[in-house]
Amino acid sequence: MKTLLLTLVVVTIVCLDLGYTRTCFITPDVKSKPCPPGQEVCYTKTWCDGFCGIRGKRVDLGCAATCPTPKKTGIDIICCSTDDCNTFPLRPRGRLSSIKDHP
């Protein structure tokens, strides 16, 4: 009887995966951190501001309970649901200009 009870406890712990928390990259640190309870979705939100042409899109990384919906046009949100799946997006390399480009 004790063996059966112990087996049931072990199976329950394995099946429930007690204490698991999703980890996502979080800005501004861009470090992997555990998400708060109930937030199992990682997101990457990008948008342009007044300096987009100079420094590229702004980026916000974080956790959410569900995939956020953009509140304005021009905001892109990508969601995923595995640990640390919301890496910082790569920016295309800009071309350095020279004095010859500006007569």
From Swiss-Prot:
Subcellular location: Secreted
One family name in Pfam for this protein: Toxin_cobra-type
Signal peptide start and end residues: 1-21
Keyword flag Magnesium: no
Domain of life of the native organism: Eukaryota
Disulfide bonds: C24-C42, C35-C63, C48-C52, C67-C79, C80-C85
Gene Ontology CC entries for this record: extracellular region
Annotated coiled-coil segments of the chain: none
Primary location recorded for the protein, binned into one broad class: secreted
GO MF annotation terms: acetylcholine receptor inhibitor activity; ion channel regulator activity; toxin activity
Tissue: Expressed by the venom gland.
Alphabetic keyword roster: Acetylcholine receptor inhibiting toxin, Disulfide bond, Ion channel impairing toxin, Neurotoxin, Postsynaptic neurotoxin, Secreted, Signal, Toxin
Similarity comment: family membership: Belongs to the three-finger toxin family. Long-chain subfamily. Type II alpha-neurotoxin sub-subfamily.
Biological role stated in the UniProt entry: Binds with high affinity to muscular (alpha-1/CHRNA1) and neuronal (alpha-7/CHRNA7) nicotinic acetylcholine receptor (nAChR) and inhibits acetylcholine from binding to the receptor, thereby impairing neuromuscular and neuronal transmission.
Protein name: Pseudonajatoxin b homolog
Organism the protein comes from: Pseudonaja textilis
